[in-house]
Every structure is written in C-alpha cells, then in structure tokens.
C-alpha cells in the first residue's frame, strides 16, 4: 500500500485549558482515502469539555487529540475510480463503524461497540478530529453538496443529523404535541426537525432567556422558563399534555419532569447526556405506559441532514453566535464555553 505524508496544521488538545496550533504530519493512503481540505468547523459540547476538563463524559484525554467532529471541506485528492471529484464540496460524517459486527450488519452502526468517532478520546489511541487543514477519510464518509450552499449552513450537518435521528426515534410526529426540554443547539435543532416532521405544537423550555429566544426563532410555538410553575403545572394535568417529550438538557430535574408531562402511552426521547444515574418516577412511567427511548448520534440521518440544509428545509443560522479563524481556536473555545453569550461558535479554516 502506497502512503503519502503532508504537513498539516491542527488544533490539538493536550490537557485542561491547553489547546494549541500544532504543525504535524498527516500520513494517508491515496489509493484508499479521500484527502479533504477543511473549510469550516463547528464547536460542540464535547470539544468544550475536552478543553475545560480534558475529558468528555467517560472519554478521558490520555494523549494529544485533534479536536472536532463537525466539519466540512473541499476535496483535494481522490482514489482512482472514485465517485467523488477533486474540488467537490463535502460534509464529512465523523462516524467510522466497524461494519462487521452484528449491530452494524443489522443497520445499527451508531451503537457499534468498535465505533471510531472522529475527535473522540473514547479509545486509546484516540481518533483525531477535523479541526485541521486536511483530513484523510473514506469515500463513504463524504457527502457532496451543491456549490451554492453556504458553508456556515452546511457545517450543521452533524448536529442536525443528531436531531433528525432523535425525531426518528420518536416515531410519527404528524399532529403530535411536542415538548423539548433544553434549548441549546441540539435542542433547537430538535425543535426545527420536529416541526419539519409535522408536529402540530412544539413547546420549549430553558432557564436561559437567550436560549428561549433562540427556540422561538427555530420554530417553537412557546418557550417557557421551567422554574415558572404557573406555566408548567398545567402540563401535568389529566395525566400529561405532550405526546412526545425530547429531553435535550441532561439536567436531572428536566429528565424527571418528562414522566409527569408526557401523556399516557406517550414517548420520551432522551437526547441530552446527563449524569450516569438520575432519579426517575418509575411509578408514573409504569402506570401511564410511557415509552422511554435513548437517542445516540445517527445512522442514515447524516445524508438526510445534508439534503435538508442544502435545500433550505431548515435554517440553522440563528444559532451561529460567532466565527473565529483557526489560529483563534482558544478564543473560540472560551466563547463557546460561555453559555451566557454563545450557542454555536464556528471555526473558519480556509
């Protein structure tokens, strides 16, 4: 197998509050991999956690890690016979399942136990992400999109795919009443996806007035402070008001509240990553026969997300708080970590 090596400038996390611009070699197989010059990236919660705490959930930083799993770019080189073309603009799916295990063969690649997810410290060695000048990926990871589509829109492909998968986990939403608890970037994209999927009423909650305002911009009919009991109490009357609750905050109180607010035979979709254990009113879930399902990453929804963004079916731009150059990555991470100021912060590479 022939290997090529190029110089690559990357945003590398070394430890707590230690992210640096590093010039390092990128070795790739030109006969097997697609070389993509990165144009833009979006900072996600996990990037912030690696920066602030050197860990994201159970994934602990043991070695330097190139951050980023939300990124798009322009193809620089392709293997002979590829369906892709040099100069084509692509969104890159950061998922790299094994495609051999029973789960993958059943079409459940998002829960593959050997998943190599770009920008993740789950495994050692870690899997580098896309906050760099170039990445080498498989052809299957590249989803082309139209030249006229805006980069700042298309870089939402990965988080919107998460939201679309959550909506798919809920089943048919046509005519349904929906609650979304937590109106951060993912919660707001769930709001937009639920509305697109036919929900007749979408209500959002968040403690932050800024987040509630964004929820309204992204399609919520109402946005409520969850501490305002005069607004939330009616949702528990008559056994529960909402057909589907999407829990996107990970906050224990919000997680528990979904059992009260969901009507009998309704569905709770857990999207937010909360603590390892939480208290849940199981009695309510039992007697109301509420179905609780998890939602983790995505499968085919990544391609769907690209098409929705490309066609303007969903406009994510209200969520963009700021843009920074690659060499301003520390400032970008600082702002992204300040939830009083930022929803989605983007990095511009080219």
Residue ranges, per PLM feature:
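C-terminal hydrophobic helical "lid"/dimerization subdomain
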Residues: 2-10, 256-257, 299-350
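Glycine-rich beta-strand-centered segment in the early N-terminal region that forms part
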Residues: 27-41, 55-105, 146-149
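N-terminal Rossmann-like NAD(P) cofactor-binding module of classical short-chain dehydrogenase/reductase
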Residues: 91, 246, 269
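NAD(P)H dinucleotide-binding glycine-rich loop of Rossmann-like/cofactor-binding domains
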Residues: 98-181
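Adenosine-nucleotide cofactor-binding segment
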Residues: 180-183, 195-257
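N-terminal Rossmann-fold NAD(P) dinucleotide-binding loop
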Residues: 187-188
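Glycine-rich phosphate-binding loop and adjacent beta-alpha segment
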Residues: 252-313, 348-350
């Amino acid at each position: 197998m022939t290997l090529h090596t190029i110089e690559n400038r990357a945003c590398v996390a070394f430890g707590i509050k230690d992210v640096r611009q590093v010039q390092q070699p990128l070795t790739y197989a030109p006969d097997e991999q697609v070389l993509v010059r990165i144009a833009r990236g979006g900072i996600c919660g996990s990037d912030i956690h690696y920066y602030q705490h050197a860990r994201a959930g159970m994934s602990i930083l043991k070695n330097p890690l190139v951050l980023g799993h939300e990124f798009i770019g322009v193809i620089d080189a392709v293997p002979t016979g590829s369906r892709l073309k040099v100069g084509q603009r692509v969104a890159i799916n950061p998922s790299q399942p094994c495609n051999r295990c029973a789960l993958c063969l059943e079409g459940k690649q998002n829960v593959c136990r050997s998943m190599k997810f770009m920008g993740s410290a789950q495994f050692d060695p870690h899997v580098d992400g896309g906050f760099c000048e170039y990445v080498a990926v498989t052809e299957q990871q590249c989803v082309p999109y139209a030249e006229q589509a805006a980069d700042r829109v298309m870089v939402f492909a990965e988080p919107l795919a998460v939201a679309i998968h959550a909506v798919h986990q809920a089943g048919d939403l046509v005519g349904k009443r929906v609650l979304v608890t937590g109106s951060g970037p993912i919660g707001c994209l769930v709001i937009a996806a639920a509305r697109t999927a036919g929900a007749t009423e979408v209500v959002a909650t968040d403690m932050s007035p800024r987040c509630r305002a964004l929820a309204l911009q992204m399609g919520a009919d109402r946005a409520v402070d969850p501490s305002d009991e005069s607004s939330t109490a009616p949702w528990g009357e008559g056994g529960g008001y909402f057909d589907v609750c999407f829990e996107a905050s990970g906050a224990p109180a919000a997680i528990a509240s979904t059992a009260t607010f969901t009507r009998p035979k309704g569905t709770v979709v857990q999207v937010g990553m909360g603590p390892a254990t939480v208290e849940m009113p199981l009695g309510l879930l039992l007697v109301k026969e509420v179905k609780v399902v998890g939602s983790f990453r995505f499968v085919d929804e990544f391609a769907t997300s690209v098409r929705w963004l490309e066609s303007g079916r969903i406009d994510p731009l209200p969520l963009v708080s700021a843009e920074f150059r690659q060499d301003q990555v520390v400032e970008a991470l600082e702002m992204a970590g300040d939830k009083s100021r930022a929803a989605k912060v983007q990095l511009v590479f080219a």
